[in-house]
Amino acid sequence: MISHYIRFKIMTNILLSPEKSENDQELPIRPSYLQEFVGQQQIKENLSVFIKAAKSRNEHLDHTLFYGPPGLGKTTLAKIISNEIGGNFKSTSGPAILKVADLAAILTNLERNDVLFIDEIHRLNTAVEEVLYPAMEDFELDIIIGEGSAARSVKITLPKFTLIGATTRLGLLSNPLRDRFGIPMRLNFYNTEELKKVLNRASKLLDIDLTDSGSEEIAKRSRGTPRIALRLLRRIRDFAAVDGKSRVDKEISDFGLNRLEVDRIGLDSNDYRYLKFIADNYNGGPVGIETIAAALSEQRDALEETIEPYLIQIGLLQRTPRGRVITIAAFEHLKMPVPNQSHHQFNIFNEHE
């Protein structure tokens, strides 16, 4: 048993290493509590109710699932929940939990009211999922110790913890796992005013002199995504500094965004490659996602998670049973002639490779 315990501790140190963001500068501007979090108003209000109710009953918060496009605050909300309920925050990801022993190492090191955050939870393998079910429902862990005739089952009682899962691909989550989350919440794209609030808050924390017009210009071109807005703010600050400007206004924001190849509605060079490929080679589509991925030398997951959601959101792309189709609005935005409408609609129902 001691050797197994040591092995569990070693694996825990690897799997639950402190989470690092894409940019360490993001850490000081992450909100720590719900009242500091901008946007997702209904989610915030509901979470506040659920957290207060759980604390009043001296119970753990029910397991929570955040889903939606990347960059909208799933990880941040998980950390906020941990702060609000006063538990430790432990973070890992679906791909990092390869074996049942990996999961056991994590679960046996949790304490009461801890928050276990699993990013990309849709990528857990089936064997790990099956061990997770009783841990979520009954707070028990069944593991096999030993091999062959010496093998025996050991049941370990776990403390009452809260599992928070995050995924950009809800459809890839198995039904049994999805049904075990008592609080499923979808995060939606931000509007311009919400992004301006995110930018204004960040500019104060980063000591950036950001004007209202500069904030609006960045917000309008940030794809409805706070993570992108904050990244663009930092890069435009660089352009302003090198250009000898003390403040970030609309002029320097527009200049910087153009240099970064971000157009007036937030499309970048990758979006243009995607749209032009379908327009030039398939007359607007339909075309299969695997064909697009191969032609652009991109992973299918990258296209489905980072490029397509925003294009669909703003009405430039449609997913059909036959494949991807770009809309008339997309042709107009590309300043390309719109194909014959009847022919374009007819093609949607004919198979293309």
Swiss-Prot record:
What reaction gets catalysed by this protein? ATP + H2O = ADP + phosphate + H(+)
Looking at the keywords, is Calcium present?
no
User: Where located?
Assistant: Cytoplasm
Q: Where does ATP bind?
A: 29-30, 71, 74-76, 137-139, 180, 190, 227
Give positions of region: Head domain (RuvB-H). 264-353
Tell me the residue numbers annotated for binding Mg(2+).
Answer: 75
Query: Is the keyword Hydrolase assigned to this protein?
Result: yes
Domain of life of the native organism: Bacteria
The record's listing under Pfam families reads: AAA_lid_4 (PF17864), RuvB_C (PF05491), RuvB_N (PF05496)
InterPro entries per UniProt: AAA+_ATPase (IPR003593), AAA_lid_4 (IPR041445), DNA_helicase_Holl-junc_RuvB (IPR004605), P-loop_NTPase (IPR027417), RuvB-like_N (IPR008824), RuvB_C (IPR008823), WH-like_DNA-bd_sf (IPR036388), WH_DNA-bd_sf (IPR036390)
Write out the ranges of the annotated region (Large ATPase domain (RuvB-L)): 4-190
Outline what the protein does.
Answer: The RuvA-RuvB-RuvC complex processes Holliday junction (HJ) DNA during genetic recombination and DNA repair, while the RuvA-RuvB complex plays an important role in the rescue of blocked DNA replication forks via replication fork reversal (RFR). RuvA specifically binds to HJ cruciform DNA, conferring on it an open structure. The RuvB hexamer acts as an ATP-dependent pump, pulling dsDNA into and through the RuvAB complex. RuvB forms 2 homohexamers on either side of HJ DNA bound by 1 or 2 RuvA tetramers; 4 subunits per hexamer contact DNA at a time.
**Assembly description:** Homohexamer. Forms an RuvA(8)-RuvB(12)-Holliday junction (HJ) complex. HJ DNA is sandwiched between 2 RuvA tetramers; dsDNA enters through RuvA and exits via RuvB. An RuvB hexamer assembles on each DNA strand where it exits the tetramer. Each RuvB hexamer is contacted by two RuvA subunits (via domain III) on 2 adjacent RuvB subunits; this complex drives branch migration. In the full resolvosome a probable DNA-RuvA(4)-RuvB(12)-RuvC(2) complex forms which resolves the HJ.
Domains (record comment):
Has 3 domains, the large (RuvB-L) and small ATPase (RuvB-S) domains and the C-terminal head (RuvB-H) domain. The head domain binds DNA, while the ATPase domains jointly bind ATP, ADP or are empty depending on the state of the subunit in the translocation cycle. During a single DNA translocation step the structure of each domain remains the same, but their relative positions change.
Q: Which family does it belong to?
A: Belongs to the RuvB family.
Q: What is this protein called?
A: Holliday junction branch migration complex subunit RuvB
